């Protein structure tokens, strides 16, 4: 059965939060249905919205198995969402030219600014393998990371994180999701001031276990700078010079 969903505006704030918290009731889509969507404005919250959402969603047995959505932010930047199913494998992609409205809904992240987001997820049965990439963003407040930096005697960087924020050029997370457990195979984040590599797992509402390496850019510069000739080329003789200048 096909349903036409059209309108001037829709407040998706609570719906998005329920999906993030995995508390959304999907029992209303227990039949095979298709939604044709055409909504002029959808609100993420009181400050952020997307315009001209158009596309199709196909549901079967309480599950979205096919879809193609496209919308625009106020500056004509894009949101794209697709779902395809083939031979028992479901592939989901999400691209946001503006990642901030979505990322800031995660309660453990505060002060997130800027960035674009690219998500790819492949699901077979109840197990999914996913890659999340975020580019060119800034974190102003991340309590767990701030505590780690302070304990590691990197108070200067901790102060920046809780003040003006730390910029990152690229973030990538490769992870598996099965049941209530997320296994993080690798996280890496690269920025002018600091680089991070981690792995671990998260059990919903129970345990977070992460381990890895956190390296300030100044430490990298010192290590490379000690290499004769090559170190001077890569790092430079003055602050901010060379390939690894900060």
Q: What do these predicted regions represent?
A:
Residues 1-170, 174-182, 194-246:
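Membrane-proximal interfacial segments on either side of biological membranes
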Residues 188-190:
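Short, glycine-rich nucleotide/cofactor-binding loops
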